[in-house]
Amino acid sequence: MLKRIVGLPARRCFHRTSFLLGSDFETVHIPNTNHFKDLLIENGKFQEDQATTIVEIMTDAIRGGVNHVSQDLAKREKLTQLSYQQRVDFAKLRDQLLSADRSEFHNIQNEYESVKNDLEKLRNKLREEITKTNAGFKLDLSLEKGRIREESSHHDLQIKEIDTKIEQEVTNMKMQIDSVKTQVMQWLIGVCTGTFALVLAYMRLLT
């Protein structure tokens, strides 16, 4: 493209140009442009207007590149500042969150201790109530066992008395039955003896 603009030969050699970096496009200064133009005329066999055009084009290109680089550097500096500010803000936010977490953790810990103490009191109260209930139940059970034992002993005595009465009644009935049997036997013997005497008397009368 450069060859088409200034009508340059097919191959030319150029030397690098030193420059100073400023803060914007207007402050970029490239020294010794006339020296480079003279070198192009002497060594490159360019005409003066061609050398001037080449130097101006190269100067504009270098200034544009320097301006672009300076803008990138400025953006990078702004990004660095922004990154630093974000780190600072993040550190503040982290400190605030940590402080809030500590405060919340402290509150939760206090609530936990309060609930723990309440549960301990409730457990002790329940233990006392259970102990009292068990003691009352054991006392009632012991009294009930004693009452049942007394009633059982009383029932045993009544059963023994009834058994004794039954045995006495059975013995009396046996004695009465034996007495009746004896009387019946005596009566039968008397009847048989009388009958036998009557038969003998009747037989004597017949003879």
Curated annotation (Swiss-Prot):
Protein's cellular compartments: Mitochondrion; Membrane
One Pfam family hit: CCDC90-like
Coiled-coil stretches noted in the UniProt entry, renumbered to this chain: 100-136
The keyword Membrane is assigned to this record: yes
Segments traversing the membrane: 184-206
InterPro entries found in the cross-reference section: CCDC90-like (IPR024461)
GO biological process, one term: mitochondrial cytochrome c oxidase assembly
GO CC, one annotated term: mitochondrial inner membrane
Keywords for this protein: Coiled coil, Membrane, Mitochondrion, Transit peptide, Transmembrane, Transmembrane helix
Keyword Protease: no
Topology in the lipid bilayer: Single-pass membrane protein
Family: Belongs to the CCDC90 family.
Official protein name in the record: Protein FMP32, mitochondrial
Source species: Saccharomyces cerevisiae (strain ATCC 204508 / S288c) (Baker's yeast)
Gene expressing this chain: FMP32
